[in-house]
């Protein structure tokens, strides 16, 4: 039979209210001896709180919803893992939703999470989600007093809680590295044109180019962050005869490298390549890709901190946190000045 608070109270010879307060961290007014006795009994009797009953009293379910655009993308899989880890440390449950980069599915999942009375929702937007759709979803969430935070993929709004990487700096660092190695004829394989993070990476890359008078105008190819697109675009990119390629994410770089090797080209002897994300599986061993490191663990932690702040400060101004990336120099780039 499942142990209840009543069972613990009987054995501790105290009231149910006392047991409840101690187990919820509010028993400071009771003696340390009694507190220890109650906690020990709860552990020995394998007591598990009734979360439904707790939520009815506290109006909290201790549940967070996470809506991601594509969990098959390893970057988002790693992000989900880090957020789950943070939730576990905070004793929060996590509900994971995969929108498949579909704004309608994204909205449906948000509606479902609202219906499940989650305490907060973290969203990495689908590629084609508009400002209007995002604000509509935020309003529905706000009406139910649910915390809402955008992560990674953003929209240019000062009304939304959001946590992101400084993608303009990331684009700048990647390009600056290639320029410092003596490369002057560059190609960029970008992300989807509609995504703000791809636009910011391009802006940063172009800023670095503008600081180098001897640099040629870069060749810009539109990608979609998939390895398939990187593979598909490789021949077209090579025809422009760059000495180096900046792929706007690691998956695109991975697809590029596979095709380039099939074409008999060597990395970095024939072409230098820089990626973006620093996905562990793609950046060790044979590949050893120079890339922009996104601190996913910090991104996840800040997103949860933002939700926790919003739980207690519903009417405060929007929280917007920007985390700086860094470059990881490995073996996929060559110095042309040696």
Annotate each PLM feature:
Residues 1-61:
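N-terminal helix-turn-helix DNA-binding module of bacterial transcription factors
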Residues 4, 233-338:
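Flexible loop/turn connectors
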Residues 69-78, 97-105, 127-131, 153, ...:
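Hinge/beta->alpha junction and helix N-cap segments in small-molecule ligand-binding domains
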Residues 59-176, 180, 235-240:
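Alpha-helical recognition/docking segments in bacterial nutrient-uptake
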